[in-house]
From Swiss-Prot:
Keywords: ATP synthesis, ATP-binding, Cell membrane, CF(1), Hydrogen ion transport, Ion transport, Membrane, Nucleotide-binding, Translocase, Transport. F-type ATPases have 2 components, CF(1) - the catalytic core - and CF(0) - the membrane proton channel. CF(1) has five subunits: alpha(3), beta(3), gamma(1), delta(1), epsilon(1). CF(0) has three main subunits: a(1), b(2) and c(9-12). The alpha and beta chains form an alternating ring which encloses part of the gamma chain. CF(1) is attached to CF(0) by a central stalk formed by the gamma and epsilon chains, while a peripheral stalk is formed by the delta and b chains. It is a peripheral membrane protein. The lineage of its organism: Bacteria, Bacillati, Actinomycetota, Actinomycetes, Micrococcales. GO terms for molecular function: ADP binding; ATP binding; proton-transporting ATP synthase activity, rotational mechanism. It is found in: Cell membrane. Produces ATP from ADP in the presence of a proton gradient across the membrane. The alpha chain is a regulatory subunit. It comes from Paenarthrobacter aurescens (strain TC1). It holds the Pfam family ATP-synt_ab_C. It is an enzyme of class 7 (translocase). This is ATP synthase subunit alpha. The gene is atpA. Belongs to the ATPase alpha/beta chains family.
């Protein structure tokens, strides 16, 4: 048998050759967790010690989850999708990504879910970028005071509760009082600005439907399309059939889509319809995650849920492009109780509230705005000069009218001044009525309110106020340049006021003299205008019996 000999040089050369040719591979560290329990849209996962808060996780069937509770031994995960295929023992992988949504102009005219995926069967959406859902709100130095008007097209709001671009204005009221109608009318009213092509005037709108019936969201979309407003609107839909996690995330998705445009120097209007259902969804998620409950079983951070969302609405400084995002959150009350937990939270966060009263709605006063409770804390600085001039005493006049109306129920004989308040107040209330999907340009609103507050409608029967208003505005449109002047200057000077006075006096002479259109017909009560000086009881024209 041959003797085995080992040459040290050969060994050295072999090792050198191997070392020279060795190429180390890219070692990958993969964390894999396992599902311990899964039910009701919540999964508990163990084995992922390095996961981040709000990180996306991927289950075996491809469903995504959102890491929420980071406990010592396991993670509480919100399942973003169908959870019926997720079972105990399945693997869960990290993605290393924070939850974000695609954004861009391609989203205009589309309906998407809270993850930014289209659900309107119109094909894929080519996104310009992605934006994290949990994005920090602009800081104090990045903001500018609200000074540009956001016109709703509704006389009761634009005159007494004005909204500015960058403001947060709460719409609050019982169910079926017209909250969504106000939001939709506001979107429709932006059509003229969009058609102008002026970037400084155009407003991109985002409607976030949370917990609504799918048929309701579909009806909103159809309404916007019928009125030509869908082309500048994105709808983020999370109907009642969606899991609680989707309803919780939907407002943040809509806000992220709007913030992309805001930081691009554009103006955005976001409707959150409604935040009370988002709070209920967050309560359900928190209880399933076994977080300790607080008042009304809501978690302790439910205030932060809404504050960090609404604080994103802002008017940015000129250095950041001077864009703005206006928020119109909607909250539903029960039995007009605005002192409940969620309503008081959102009232304290926002810059004002529009309170809708069910009694007014049932009395056919629509929009059913309760002027006494409603307020806009910062919108007054954004109100156009002409509107501020004519509506200065409107709120006080209506408050005095309501007080006098309550007093008149028990008083058999009133002096002339009291009758004057009742006469004018009834006509102002009628003047503030407005049909749905028929927003008014601001110059038309100024003329209507000017006529009412200056007593030019006192001799018009209440039931004919609406017809008088529409025909007078049509008369001005075709036979006068007053509306054009008001639209261009936004100032009601003495010359314009004199021209308006001459026009309405002339119009009333012809209007009262019309044959079939005579304002006082069979069965109508005839009233006479009462000036402030008519204090003698004899000067009051009695009603015809």
């Amino acid at each position: 048998m041959a003797e085995l000999t080992i040459n040290a040089d050969d060994v050295r050369n072999a090792l050198n050759e191997f070392a020279a040719s060795y190429e180390p591979g890219n070692a990958e560290r993969v964390e894999v967790g396992r599902v311990t329990t899964a039910s009701d849209g919540i999964a508990r996962v163990e084995g992922l010690p390095s996961v981040m808060a709000n990180e996306l996780l991927r289950f075996e069937d491809g469903t995504l989850g959102l890491a929420q509770n980071l406990d010592v031994r396991e993670i509480g995960v919100i399942i973003l999708g169908d959870f019926t295929g997720i079972e105990e023992g399945q693997e869960v992988h990290r993605t290393g990504e924070i939850l974000s949504v695609p954004v861009g102009d391609a989203f205009l005219g589309r309906v998407v879910d809270p993850l930014g995926q289209p659900i309107d069967d119109l094909g894929e959406i080519k996104a310009e970028a992605t934006r994290a859902l949990e994005l920090q709100a602009p800081g104090v130095t990045e903001r500018k005071s609200v000074h540009e008007p956001m016109q709703t097209g509704l006389k009761a709001i634009d005159a007494m509760i004005p909204i500015g671009r960058g403001q947060r204005q709460l719409i609050i009221g019982d169910r079926q009082t017209g909250k969504t109608a106000i939001a939709v009318d506001t979107i429709i009213n932006q059509k003229a600005n969009w058609a102008s092509g002026d970037v400084t005037k155009q407003v991109r709108c985002v409607y976030v439907g949370v917990g609504q019936k799918a048929s309701t969201i579909a009806a909103v979309r159809q309404t916007l399309e019928d009125h030509g407003a869908l082309e500048y609107t994105t709808i983020v839909a999370s109907p009642a059939s969606d899991p609680a996690g989707f309803k919780y995330l939907a407002p943040y998705a809509g806000s992220a889509i709007g913030q992309h445009w805001m930081y691009g120097g554009k103006h955005v209007l976001v409707i959150f319809d409604d935040l009370s259902k988002q709070a209920e969804a967050y309560r359900a998620v928190s209880l399933l995650l076994r977080r300790p409950p607080g008042r009304e079983a809501y978690p302790g951070d439910v205030f932060y849920l809404h504050s960090r969302l609404l604080e994103r609405c802002a008017k940015l400084s000129d250095e950041l492009g001077a864009g703005s995002m206006t928020g119109l959150p909607i909250v539903e009350t029960k039995a007009n109780d605005v002192s409940a937990y969620i309503p008081t939270n959102v009232i304290s966060i926002t810059d004002g509230q529009i309170f809708l009263q069910s009694d007014l709605f049932n009395a056919n006063q629509r929009p059913a705005v309760d002027v006494g409770v409603s307020v806009s804390r910062v919108g007054g600085a954004a109100q156009v000069k002409s509107m501020k001039k004519v509506s200065g005493t409107l709120k006080l006049d209506l408050a005095q009218y309501r007080d006098m109306q309550a007093f008149a129920m028990f008083a058999s004989d009133l002096d002339a001044a009291s009758r004057q308040q009742l006469t004018r107040g009834a006509r102002l209330m009628e003047l503030l009525k407005q049909g749905q999907y028929s927003p008014f340009p601001v110059e038309n609103q100024v003329v209507s309110i000017w006529a009412g507050t200056n007593g030019y409608l006192d001799d018009v029967p209440v039931e004919d106020i609406s017809r008088f208003e529409s025909e007078f505005l049509e008369h001005l449109t075709h036979k006068s340049s007053i509306l054009t002047t008001l639209a261009q200057t936004n100032v009601l000077d003495d010359d314009t006021a004199a021209a308006l006075k001459e026009a309405i006096v002339s119009f009333k002479k012809g209007f009262f003299g019309e044959g079939d259109n005579h304002l006082v017909g069979a069965g109508h009560e005839e009233h006479a205008a009462i000036s402030g000086g008519d204090v003698d009881q004899e000067k009051i024209v009695k009603q015809k019996r």
